[in-house]
Every structure is written in C-alpha cells, then in structure tokens.
Amino acid sequence: MSSTTSSSRSDLEKVPVPQVTPRDSDSDKGSLSPEPSTLEAQSSEKPPHHIFTRSRKLQMVCIVSLAAIFSPLSSNIYFPALDDVSKSLNISMSLATLTITVYMIVQGLAPSFWGSMSDATGRRPVFIGTFIVYLVANIALAESKNYGELMAFRALQAAGSAATISIGAGVIGDITNSEERGSLVGIFGGVRMLGQGIGPVFGGIFTQYLGYRSIFWFLTIAGGVSLLSILVLLPETLRPIAGNGTVKLNGIHKPFIYTITGQTGVVEGAQPEAKKTKTSWKSVFAPLTFLVEKDVFITLFFGSIVYTVWSMVTSSTTDLFSEVYGLSSLDIGLTFLGNGFGCMSGSYLVGYLMDYNHRLTEREYCEKHGYPAGTRVNLKSHPDFPIEVARMRNTWWVIAIFIVTVALYGVSLRTHLAVPIILQYFIAFCSTGLFTINSALVIDLYPGASASATAVNNLMRCLLGAGGVAIVQPILDALKPDYTFLLLAGITLVMTPLLYVEDRWGPGWRHARERRLKAKANGN
C-alpha cells in the first residue's frame, strides 16, 4: 500500500495556493473558472488522473502505436504492387486503384462501430477481436484468386486494422491529462506513421522478389506479433472499468503479464469513477452526433481536406513516377521514404511543440486570472482554459508550407526525381503535423469518449480521402499534374479561414456544449 501511495503522490497535480489578489479583470472569467483560493483544497481532495508513471504510459503508447501501424501500413505497403496486381488479375490500373478506395471507405466506416464498442466494453476486448479479423483477412488475401475476392477481403482487412487507431487514441485519452497529451499523441502518430515510411519499401521488395501475395503473409506474421504484445502486456484502461489504474482487473481485461507479476497499485475496494455504458445500435451511431457540434465539425472537416489532398498525392505516386521516371516496383517503393520520414518527423515535432504551447498558454491564462506562476492548468481543473488556442498555435506556419509545397509538386515532376521526393517529405511533414493537432484537439473536446471521437475523425477523413483517391486519376488525365496539384493547393487555401473561425469562436461553442450536457445530466 505504501508504494501505491507514493506513486499516487508523484502523479498528483500540485497546485499552490495563490498569494496574490486576483485582478479586477477576473470578474468576467465566468463561472467555469475556479476561484484561486479553492485550488489547493481541490487538488488535495482529488486522486491523480492516473497512477501510471510517465515511463509506463510511454510503454503503453508504444504498444498501441505499433498496433495502429497496421492501418496505414496495410494501405501503403500495397501501393508499389498496383501495377503487378493489374497485370496478374488482368484488370485496368483504375480497377486496381479502386481497391485502395474500397479500403479507405471501410477504413472510415469501421472505427465508428469499433470505437463506440470500445468506449462501452473496454479497449482490450475490441483490440483482440479486431486483430483476429485482420489476421483472417490477410490470410484470405494471400490466397485470393480473382478481383472480386481481392476487393472483398481488402474491405475485411480495413475493417480489422482501422479500429486500432481509434482504440489507441482511446487508451491515450484514458491515461492522460491535456497538459501531457500533446507529446504522447505525437509519439502515437509518429510511431504509427512508421508504416508510411517502411510500408512502400517493404511492398516494393516483396513484389519485386516474391510477388505481391507475399505482402499479405508478411502482414499476417507482423500482425500476430502485435496481437501477442497486446495479450501479454496491455492492461485495460477504460475508466469505467479500470478507473485511474487502482481498480483490480479480471478476465479479458487483465493482461497475461499480471498473472506472473501481479497488478501493482491496486487499492482495496477501489471503484471506477464512471458508470459503464451499454452497447447498443444507438450507442454505435451516437458518435455521429458529434458532427452537429460546430467546433467539432470545423476541426474534423479541415483536417479531412488536408488528409484528402495528401492521399491524392501519395496514391498517384506509383503511376506518375512509373510513367515519368520509368521506375520499377522496388524503386517506386524507395521513393516513398520521403513521405514516410515526413510523416514521422511531423508527428513527433508538432506533438512536442503542442506540449510547449500548452505550457505557454498556461502562463498566459495564469497571468490573466491572477494565478501564481507555475500553476498547472488543464480542462478538468479549469474548464474555461482555451485549449483551442493551446493546440492551434502551430497551425498557421504548418498550413502555409503545406499549401506552397502542394502547389509546386506538379511542376516538380518535370525536374530531377529528388525534387518531388523532397516536396513529398514536406507535404507529409505538414499534413501529419496537422493530423496530430487535429487528433489531440478532438480528444480534448470529447475526453470521455475519445475512441468514439477519434472514430468520427477517421470516418470523415477516410470518406473524403476515398473520394479524392477515386477521382485523382481522371483529374490528372484532364488537367495534367501541374494544374491538378495547383488546384488542390487552391482548395486548401480557400478552406484555411476555418482555422480562424475555430480559434475565435470554438471556446464559446465548447462552453455552451458543456453547460448543455451538464444540464441534461442533471435532468434540467
């Protein structure tokens, strides 16, 4: 028990008693902001958000990130094989590309079901179930004999792999506060996006030397290893089941390692802080109601526009590079390294910048409200904290670079191969950086349903992205690369004012929603 108490104290937020009188301007800060004189009392009464140490949280983030690799990996590893699939099954390149579109559609739809289920039944059961679906799909793909089977099992593959992103985000939402969430979401995105870098390289190697079917056997083996790590090491984190880590886990919610080591930090008689929700068809579709919230819709829609443009760049790479530069499957796979490294570095860097920006916004908030320097602030303790401002400080320079590089990408195909690869790096860096900001903000807006919120995010991205991938080839045929990517840059530029709208009016919309939900919960 003593070790548990020590761990709890180390994680407990320490908020000092203010020794200064709040400024007159504090009078207009609203009822959502706690009085400074009550901060110490609040912190002494509240248990830590989660008892896991920083290193333990990092370990769990790595496990769920490696699991989430399989959603982008299963899509991107397939890109260099498109030409071989077309020839092997005697179909056109457009039909081969359609298998990517189908994958992305299901990739968008499936997490809405799995995410809400994991918010109700737990993260581990859904993780395990979806991975079993994924492994079965890969075995079937490796043995598929015709185009119909390939399409059907690609859809099943997407249904199994896509949920790993929303469930992984749910795990992060369960164990983190807003002030530490940015860097962990960045790590989650960076490790996950490793699939963007290594996927096409592996796909090119397998296709060149072993045939495209070997891709699916590789995914079966790698997916099995990831499933094993979840079974052995990942505990249940859903707060209505596991609480803040002090509730004893049993059955499927208990990782195999606890059978050997025991579960540390358990408090006798500890109960979850929230009630477990029931799974129903209503709960499955409930996350779609998030889209009627103005701040959520704007955040998701703009992120989806960027995702669509990025998807159109990557999905057209195989055909463009093969036609313009005459590259083989292996060489095309290697050209995706720029895109992959851009994804990883963008997610890592922007994730850590978000934590820095959170601290910067904390200081500004404390100065405005008369709190002492060093006061830790998050949405749970201070609901009026401007999380939108904290998350979106990096957005402006990131989107500016994204628009410029997309506009130049089509023209770059007339130059040396290195130029479009470098531009792909910056396009991927900026797009993934924006996804990281987008993902963290969505979790902040719905912290109690982070998996469902992430699933809706994934739904909008993938449906718009699938539409973009489906039409990119006809647009390229009609406008040629120069004007195609200039058009995409222009569309992004036109949508950019949405960022100002979210920054300016988002906090007010969030406060109104919180008051409405609180009144509904109280039966008013």
UniProtKB/Swiss-Prot annotation:
Transmembrane segments: 60-80, 95-115, 125-145, 155-175, 186-206, 215-235, 296-316, 332-352, 395-415, 417-437, 459-479, 481-501
Residues that carry a glycan: 90, 244
One Pfam family in the UniProt entry: MFS_1
Location within or outside the cell: Cell membrane
GO cellular component: plasma membrane
Keywords: Cell membrane, Glycoprotein, Membrane, Transmembrane, Transmembrane helix, Transport
Described purpose of this protein according to its UniProt entry: Transmembrane transporter that exports citrate across the cell membrane.
Family label: Belongs to the major facilitator superfamily.
Protein name according to UniProt: Citrate exporter 1
Lineage of producing organism: Eukaryota, Fungi, Dikarya, Ascomycota, Pezizomycotina
